[in-house]
């Protein structure tokens, strides 16, 4: 699994670097500081896991679909509009990853803060979340990335993402962002 992750990350970095000017660490620091998301509290993480029917143990680990104890990851995803910054909760594969998820990162759950709690607005298993530059109802469109030449496309319907056809690899554009990174 580690080799597949390294290979995928290397390919993504190589593709992302094509045709872009190199930046120095000094260039990157102000961007990181300005765009750094607020740290999530332990209570927020627990609330997100409970929103997807998972109960963390004392160390924060959960049981994935393969019955492996794993540590979830939490990533801020900017979607704009009424959603704003959502949270992507990744329940990764463990020792059984290839039999459950193939080369994918695991179970992905996209959550939106609704007051003091969180609600799931999209989920997928074994693929990647692709955030597109296009938007509907003021919120960025998303696609389920993975093998193949076209992928399920989702538009914001005001409360969650609903499937709206497919999108070809070539139509995603260079500005599409893939998660987890």
Stretch-by-stretch model annotation:
Residues 15-17:
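C-terminal motif of bacterial Sec signal peptides marking the signal peptidase cleavage site
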Residues 81-95, 135-145:
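Acidic/hydrophobic-patterned starts of short beta strands in beta-sheet-rich repeat architectures
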Residues 64, 117-122:
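A short beta-strand motif characteristic of beta-propeller blades
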Residues 1-8:
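Bacterial N-terminal signal peptides that target proteins for export
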Residues 19-51, 56-60, 65, 131-181:
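Acidic, small-residue rich beta-repeat scaffolds with periodic aromatic anchors
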Residues 66-76:
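Signature of short aromatic-glycine-proline-rich micro-motifs recurring in repeat-based ectodomains
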Residues 96-103:
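Short consensus segments that form the blades of beta-propeller domains
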């Amino acid at each position: 699994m580690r080799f597949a992750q390294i290979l995928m990350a290397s390919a993504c970095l190589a593709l992302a670097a094509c045709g872009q000017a190199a930046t120095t660490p000094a260039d990157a620091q102000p961007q990181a500081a300005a765009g750094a998301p607020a740290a999530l509290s332990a209570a927020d993480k627990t609330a997100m896991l409970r929103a997807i029917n998972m109960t963390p143990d004392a160390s924060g680990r959960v049981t994935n679909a393969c019955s492996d104890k794993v540590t979830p990851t939490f990533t801020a995803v900017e979607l704009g509009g009424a959603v704003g910054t959502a949270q992507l909760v990744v329940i990764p594969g463990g020792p059984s990853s290839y039999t459950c998820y193939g080369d994918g990162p695991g179970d992905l759950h996209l959550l939106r803060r609704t007051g003091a709690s969180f609600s799931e607005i999209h989920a997928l298993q074994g693929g990647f979340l692709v955030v597109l530059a296009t938007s509907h109802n003021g919120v960025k469109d998303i696609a389920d990335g993975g093998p193949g030449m076209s992928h399920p496309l989702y538009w914001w319907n005001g409360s969650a993402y609903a499937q709206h056809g497919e999108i070809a690899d070539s139509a995603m554009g260079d500005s599409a962002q893939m998660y987890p990174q």
